Amino acid sequence: METVVNIIYTPSNSREHIGEFSLSFDGFDGETRTVRLKFDIKELWSFSRDTSSVAFDFLVLSMLVYNVDRAIKRNRYSIDGWHRTIRMANIPVINIDAMNIGKDEFERAICFLTGDAWIFDFIQSEGYEYAPTNTPSYKIDEYEEISLFSGGLDSLIGFIDSAHRISQNKKVLLISHMELGKEKRDQVDILTNCKNNHILDGKYDRLLLNAGLKPNSWSTHSATESTFRSRSLLFFAAGIYA
């Protein structure tokens, strides 16, 4: 039982926006479903200033995997209620030769991560005319470590450890992700408490990636998968990109 998900990319008319990605696939009931995706990378881009590297291709791939993982509900798109076979078609990448070299490794690693079978079909991207204005500037040499900051207890402990481990006058760069809103509230609550109580003052900055399904953009209302197994991949990709 293979589900083929077509990736559609629509370029933006403005350099302020990266463009829009959407998914299209045949539903379990035979009806074609489409959904648009959020992919707001402005804060990450303000640090890396990059849309042409293999790291950016990996970020795009990870964002798409995360959204496909959410869109394809296990109990409807698998024989046993869990293990899905998903083919992602027309994944746009800048560095297609490098991505094809890594294709088998990507598939094996993500199959292990989510417990599914994934097949990736890459196509050559024409690139992105993305250069948003009103972005902060960063001095990269001020940062000694990157810490993935979800707002959960494990990532909070990792952040605290990093902040105490780094050299004097250096900072930790926190990388966060939000989709549903609750994640951001948890992250903000923690950092607001740090600020109000002068905890780790001057020891960190945070960049937020807003990526996920646009819930009101489904062509046909669909229940989404809630196991979030691929979210860690998106975090790693965002950290590598930054």
What are these regions (language model features)?
Residues 144, 214-242:
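Conserved adenosine/adenylate-binding substructure
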Residues 147-153:
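Short, glycine-rich nucleotide/cofactor-binding loops
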